[in-house]
Amino acid sequence: MQTLRASKCGLSTAQLPSYILDVIDALTKAGYEAYIVGGGVRDLMLGLNPKDFDAVTNATPSQIKEVFGRRCRIIGRRFELAHVYSGRELVEVATFRAPPKKAVTSAQGMILRDNNWGTIEQDFVRRDFSINAMYYQPRKGIVLDFCNAADDIKHKTLRLLGDPQTRFEEDPVRMLRTLRFAAKLNFSIAPEILDIFTPEAAYLLRDVSPHRLYDESQKLFTDRKSV
């Protein structure tokens, strides 16, 4: 794990809207760890303007609810999350996840339920792509990089964390996300993904709910660069 200076990654609090800082500050004040994670951090490092920001914390959904009260709504069964409102803005706040002791999966290996809370070290390996696994603590001015994600961003490489076949079986929607991110960000796809990213692998998508499939397909075809 590398602890990088945010300034060296081109990051500063001046780039952040007040609503995400409000969420990070409230969780920190309550005694919890809190980071900005995912596409927001990735896009800032690429010099892009993120459309939203997500947070992650060691607080459980019920504890997040205690911090924010009526501003918070717990959603999800497969992946339990907290939706926190800051003014008119919505921030998705997730709890650090650990590998399931006994995964609830479909016959094809897709994870059907994943609410095993863990540490930040356990959480990063549960994420899909390395470029989405950067943990930014804006008040401390640091970025935690567990998987050389900064190098992947620098070299514009899309790389899955873990074995690609297993990660696609866990969540087949990642196949569509691979295509979308590669096109949207103009990244090359790592060879180990291309090796198993075949038309035959599309059968995994049969287990995905119509809602999730529609949502990700819509993102794929409505993004200008993806099209």
What is the role of each PLM region?
Residues 1-226:
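Catalytic cores of the polymerase beta-like nucleotidyltransferase superfamily
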